[in-house]
């Protein structure tokens, strides 16, 4: 079995490297496979005021961790990382990184180029403070530099979680103006555009959990229409709406007010959130029949673009200690691959993979510790051998490279993963 896996890994490696482009075309969304990029990890060596943000509640320990997966940091200089007090891997200290370090972000983008990946949707949070924005600007600057250095494309994706009903829309508009006028994001040569306008994604409107504004669909539509056509020309965008999974039927995770249908129809691109909506391979196929295909038919009728979201697996035990460990197994990549195949077979021409660096919910696609012995001795860790397979740390980058090539029209995407341990 291991010989079969190694041979398949070699095939994937060669084809992924061959697919690497010097510069991704930033003038169109069509054919793109984009990752969500959190960029929210911090550590004291990079930012004494930031602490161990998103790694742990306080100093990392078995009791305080909020991540289940440990990144493979073997390619990073120790000077660019933070040693974790009291955590070890064998007889050596364990390390973590900060996205405020430009070299860390550059390494991530170098991986994207090496494996032929298109780029990222950079997460930006409306519900934060002015300090949060300033810290986000540091990471954004790093991303802009890394994009320039590697030819990967990027676009902003606002997460409105925690936004206030009466202020979030104005905050978003003001911040977008700031990004255009001051940060000059849309003037960057690799900022993603579509039909001559910069791409902007807004995630969270329409969710029925009461935690994501606005409550009134008319307010959502007003914001969408301002961004698409009502704003001064320099602020107008091709709009991606990060919507509930059941946006079309207004059920389950979606707000039920019928007015939301008009809000969704106003969006240039619909990107439904699917994390945790299915857990097994049969459920993935049922999702294609019951959701993907009807969604695509509806959007095609309305002249809109469909951007499905796929994910490699899910676990957030350390973040939510009452939850199970590894409740949505990765199945050696088969779970991710089948979602990509189904999206392509249904007719989708663009795709989002959640996420590049999300180790809190174990959806990370970047290099991850392969074996338990490569993660810290202290605490629970979900490593790539959890499914009984001997996988390299870059396995999911290689799979993403193959998926990207398929969406570029460079290769077919078969229903079965080409590598079986």
Regions found by a protein language model. Give the residues of each.
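N-terminal secretory signal peptides that target proteins for export/translocation
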Residues: 1-3
